Structure formats: C-alpha cells, structure tokens
Amino acid sequence: MPPPETSSAAAPSPPSPDPLPPWRDQLTLRGVAVAAVLGSLLCVVIHRLNLTVGVIPALNVASGLLAFFLATAWRGAAAVLGLGHHRGRPFTRQENTVIQTCAIACGSLAFSGCSSSYIFAMDRKTYELVGQDYPGNRMEDIRDPSLGWMIGFMFLIALIGPFSIVMLRKVMVIDYKLAFPGGTATALMINSLHGKTEADLAGRKVHCLVKYMSLSFGWSFFKWFFSGVGDSCGFDNFPSFGIEAFKNTFYFNFNPSYVGYGLISPHIVNCSVFLGSVISWGFLWPFIAKQAGDWYPDNLSNTDFRGLYGYKVFIAISVILGDGLYNLVKVFLIIAKEICNARSKEHDLPVQALLQDDDSSRQLLDEKRQTEIFLKDSIPTWLAVSGYIVLAAISTVAVPIIFPQLKWYLVLVCYFLAPAIAFCNSYGMGLTNLNLAPTYGKIALFVFASLVGSDGGVIAGLAACGVIMSIVCSTADLMQDFKSGYLTLSSPRSMFISQMIGVALGCIIAPLTLWLFWTAFDIGDPDGEYKAPFAIIFREMAIIGIEGFAALPRHCLEICCVFFLAALIINLMKDVVPNHVSRFIPIPMAMAVPFYIGAYFGVDMFIGTLILFAWQKIDRREADDYAVAVASGLICGDGVWSIPSAVLSILGVDPPICMSFRPSSASV
C-alpha cells in the first residue's frame, strides 16, 4: 500500500495538559437540560427552514457556541439567585462538547428521521397537490401525520443509528485522519472559549480564530441584504466566470464556509472535488443534456428521476458506493489480518497526515495524548454489535405494524445495508463536510418503491427513506462529533451516551415540533408561507419508483456501472502504484460530491486550497500554525450567522434587495 497523503495543514493543538474529568463527570444533568433546550430550538429552526426554503445550513458550530452561552448563563443565574450549590462542578470543554453532541443528535432527527420531506409526502394535502389523476397516485397511499405513529416510528428507527459503525471510529478519526472540517472548527472554537489567551502560539491562534470568525460573520450578514426572496439572488448566485458558466454552476459563490473547508482539507481532496466538478458539469451533464428528446423526454422537471436528475443522482451514488465499499472491505481485511497475526501493525490509509517537520515533537506528543484519551474509554465491540442486532430485530417486527406496506423482510434488508451506506456517508462527510443522507434516502425510496410495486410502493418507499436517512445521518453526525471530541480531549464513551440521550430526546421533540407546525399552519399550500417544497418531489419520486429501474432514462444503469468500476479501479491504483505517483491520484468519493451538489462547491474549495498553497510557499511555518485557525474562523462565523438568519426567517423578515444578473444584450 502507498504511504499516506500529506495533510494540507497542521492539526489544531489540543488544550493544555490539565487534569481531565472522568467520563461520568462529563455527563451532567445541567448538560442534558441545556441540550434539551438547544435541541428543541434546533428542531424548530430545521422544521421551519425545511417547510419554507428546503435548505438546511450546518448547525454544529452554532450549537457548540450556544451550548457554551446557555451553560454559562445557567451557572451565572444560579450565582445571582444565591443558589451556589446548583452551579455544580466547573463547566469544562469536555462538557461543552458533550452538550453539543447531544443537541445535534436531537436536532438532526428533524432533518433526517422526522423530516417533513418524506412524512408530509404521505399526507392527503400532498396527494391532492400531485393530482388525483396523476398516474400511480392512489388514495390508498395516504398517511396523515399524528403524534402516536411518528414518535413510535422515531424510537424504532433512530436509536439504532449510533450503533451501526461506532466500532470504526478509530479508523475514521485516527487511522484515516479524516478532516471533518465542521467538527474540527467546532473543536477549535470550544477550545478557544475555554482556554487561556496567553501571549503564546495558542493565544495567537485564538485571536486569529476570533478575527476571521468576526470577518466571516460580518460578510455573511452583509450578503444577506442582497439575497432577496428565494434562492436566485445575491452573492450566492454571482456569475464569476460569466453567464454561460453560471448556467452550469461554475461560479464562486463567496461562501466563507466552503473556502474554509478548502483551507482545512488536504490538497488532494480539494483538487479531487474540483476535478469532479469539471468532469460532471463541464463535460458529462452538458453532453447528456444534449440528448434530451432522445435518451429521455425533454419536458421533465429538474427533479424528475426520468430525466437528467436521474443521471446526476445515480451516477454520483455509484461513485460514492464504489469508493466507500472498497475502503470498507479494505478496513475489514486489515482488521482480519491483524487478528490473524495477533499483533498490531501500521497501515497506510487514505488522506492520512504525515508530520515531516523536524520541530514537530510537541505536536507528536499532543497527538499521542489525544489518541490515548480517545482510545481509553472505548465502546465495547460486543455492545455495538449486539445493540445493533437487538434493535434491528425489534424494528423489523414493529415497523410493519406502523407501515404494513413495508414488509418485515424489506425492513431487514434496510438494516443489512445501512452500516455499509453509513460508512460511505461518514467517509464522504469526513472529506468534504457534506452530509448526503437525503441523497441516500432518495435512492432507498426509489429502490424499495420498485420492490413493492404499485400496491403500497409509495408508502413503503417513503418509510424506507426515513429508515435509511435516520441511520446514515446520525452516524455521520456522531463521527463528526467524535472528531470534535478527539480534539477537545473528550471521552468517546460520554459522547456516545450523550448521542443516545440526544436521539431519545429527539424521538419525542422532533415529532412534537413537526406536529405543532402541522396543526398550527396550512402546510403544503403553494401560495402560503409553508409550502413544504420537497413533499411533492418525494411523493412523485416514490410514484416513479413503482415503475422500477425501467423508469430511469436510457443508458443510466450502464453509465452507473462504468463509474462504479472506475471508482474501484482508481482506489486499487492508489494502493498498488508507488507513493510518488499515488499521491497525485484523485479520490473518487471527493470527485463524486459536486456531481450532485454543483460545480460551485468545487470552485470554492479549490480557491481555499490555492490560498493555502500560496501561503505555504510564502511562509510554510506560519501557514502550518494558523491555517486551521483561519479556516475554523471562516466556518464558525458563517455557522453562527445561521442563528440570526433563521430568526429573521421565522419572524418573516426578508432581505431588502435582490441582486441578480443577466446578459448585457438582454438589457432594456
């Protein structure tokens, strides 16, 4: 196997070597209470955004900051009220990380398992909006939301998620050294909030973080004024390279978070994402679009699986699955070899950082301490495996009671496939910070609707979508939180327990808040505030799925097979060719992300890596010392802006200006 890739920036330093609280002390009633309040807030915000614009920003950074302020306010209020004994033990960075983990676990259910996209796709209003005469849209395929079945369904499908690949946390965080940009930024922010800002390198990093966090927040606030109503205005739609390139999503959208991802991720990841943008949006999609009317009807919507959208989703997923499954098999082969040899060996894994500096002894000691703590309070493998099997067995029996259309053997298939899919999604999130759980959910929707057929396939597909989304999303969130915990010296055992507590809270809070929206507002009204834009899309996808793979456009499956094999071959080449060659071979998983998201994501990350490359050429030591702090500041500032942005949206305050562009020849 080839030597590991060189990281683009030095890893952030851990907190100073103070005595660490035991894992039990990192879990507090105060923390659970704060997480419940914060999780409820996240559920409301996510449901609100999902029902209006359908776009959900990353909220882990904002959650870490809010957890700090809420817990600090708790202790301050107790002191003011003379309840000193209620202040409890000191508020540590470990408790802050655990609270953030719990709150995200609760709030993410509003995005995944209890998503309004697939739940409202089952209701009568969406059935009527699609049209009673729409082929395949049957009155029998209606299931209106109610607290009873939603809460029960959440407990059945959500608690199992954290068990799926928790035993691979060492592979993700330590062996692969995946960046998890959002988790790294959150950890650096938490460390800065709890650290001492003495005039040393750590203090200067904190000042750098605060500086760029303020700049990023200010820029996001400034951009908001020009973003108008909808998603077609503002700097996010700036045709940087011209109108024609903009039509193919080639533009720089001035998103500080994406530039931060480029600064914090290895160069090979950023270049792979950009290469994927060029291949897909520069050549592949324009070529397929020219076949409209031949390969597929040319009058389809942008979200119809029977058209160009089908190519985008299935080809992207084929590459992701090819890369993910290759690495999953590779990991298991390495583990099996170690067991057979009865001794531990070092293995070369993708995107692993090398410390080539002669003065890196302190960083080596820091990483050694981080690793020791991360491996100290482990989650037993027998517990993870048995927990997954027991919960899967219970769910396999109980889910068909709620959704008779989804037979027990189909539920079993879901749980058989879920760990492999969860690994692929977590691996991709570690590279690019994008959670593609909704994409995997759409694939599950299509596949299981086709397996069931016209008699109940719509409801079965939508329910299977919820099962897969819940497991895949919670697993990726947990792995990202493990990265934060690794950098804040938090116990993985306390984080796993807090994840389970957060999921349990979310199983009640997410359905309750969604049901409140359902009862208080006219959900799905095309002319109203809460249009639920994805509900109709998901129902139509399920209806199309009933036809099976025959509904896909011409040559779609053949092209998918080619890209799946290409992903396997590229990974194999990286493992067999010499290091001086393999380090230039792109990563298929990273290449696949812009296939579906858009080329602008690759452009933004590539600009980030160009900045870092130039910085390293000018002053390598300064770049290694401050790149992660700058990147984290950019990510944190944009993430924190999501809080006031969501509040303004909830209050119905729209940006005053819509800045848009058109060709000069069209000017009047």
Swiss-Prot record:
Q: Which domain of life is it from?
A: Eukaryota
Family annotation (InterPro entries): OPT, YSL-like
Q: Which GO terms describe its molecular function?
A: oligopeptide transmembrane transporter activity
* Feature: compositional bias, Low complexity: 1-11
Pro residues composition-biased segments:
12-22
Keywords attached to this Swiss-Prot or TrEMBL record, sorted alphabetically, are: Membrane, Transmembrane, Transmembrane helix, Transport
Q: In which tissues is it expressed?
A: Expressed in roots.
Compartment(s) where it occurs, according to its Swiss-Prot or TrEMBL record? Membrane
Pfam families annotated for this entry? OPT
- Tell me yes or no: is Membrane among this UniProt entry's keywords: yes
Q: Where are the transmembrane segments?
A: 27-47, 51-71, 102-122, 147-167, 209-229, 268-288, 315-335, 383-403, 410-430, 443-463, 501-521, 557-577, 595-615, 633-653
Protein's UniProt keywords contain Transmembrane: yes
Which purpose does this protein serve, as stated in its record? Answer: May be involved in the transport of nicotianamine-chelated metals.
Q: What is this protein called?
A: Probable metal-nicotianamine transporter YSL5
Q: What is the lineage of its organism?
A: Eukaryota, Viridiplantae, Streptophyta, Embryophyta, Tracheophyta
